[in-house]
Amino acid sequence: MSSAATKPVKRSGIIKGFNKGHAVAKRTVTSTFKKQVVTKRVAAIRDVIREISGFSPYERRVSELLKSGLDKRALKVAKKRLGSIQAGKKKRDDIANINRKASAK
């Protein structure tokens, strides 16, 4: 098997040979979707939804555990409900920030 068949080569525009085919410029695909970016609009909408709907039962339990200083237990509860340790840590930090803001008022 030749190396020309395994890796792509630049087309020459010639009808025969290894480099046969129409010569085109390779496009670079740019991603427009950013997973972690939250816009002002989305943040405002989420705040309104949170204000209307409140917290889910597991979030209330995590909040109570954090208030009593049981961070590790709160992480375990969040991990069990959300499925991954990373999601659990993020949720624990979010609820801790909400508790901090509520106590500052």
Swiss-Prot record:
Keywords: Ribonucleoprotein, Ribosomal protein. GO terms for molecular function: RNA binding; structural constituent of ribosome. InterPro entries: Ribosomal_eL36, Ribosomal_eL36_sf. GO terms for biological process: cytoplasmic translation; translation. Transmembrane segments: none annotated. Gene3D superfamilies: 60S ribosomal protein L36 (1.10.10.1760). Signal peptide: none annotated. Residues 86-105 are annotated as: Disordered. The keyword Ribosomal protein applies. It holds the Pfam family Ribosomal_L36e. It comes from the Eukaryota. GO terms for cellular component: cytosolic large ribosomal subunit. Belongs to the eukaryotic ribosomal protein eL36 family. This is Large ribosomal subunit protein eL36.
